[in-house]
């Protein structure tokens, strides 16, 4: 299974990762980035994904990258 990074896990990024998890994608293979530690904790709890505030870290070991920023 491929590793996925979601850069910018706001509303659009959350919709994307939510769909991936609901479709059976392994949440441990998803890393999401957000500037807010509170938002990152919320995403970890809700979906079981990994989070970071470092975009470079997220893309470094990912096969697919979604850029979800304004």
Model-derived features: positions:
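NAD(P)+-binding Rossmann beta1-loop-alpha1 motif at the extreme N-terminus of oxidoreductases
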Residues: 1-57
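Short, well-ordered coil/turn residues at beta-beta hairpins
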Residues: 68-69
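An anion/phosphate-binding loop that grips the pyrophosphate of nucleotide cofactors and donors
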Residues: 62-63
């Amino acid at each position: 299974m491929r590793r996925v990074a979601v850069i910018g896990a706001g509303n659009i990024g959350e919709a994307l990762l939510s769909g991936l998890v609901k479709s059976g994608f392994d949440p441990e293979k998803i890393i999401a980035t957000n500037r807010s530690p509170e938002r990152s904790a919320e995403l970890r709890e809700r979906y079981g994904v990994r989070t970071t505030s470092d975009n470079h870290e997220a893309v470094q070991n990912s096969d697919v990258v979604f850029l979800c920023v304004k």
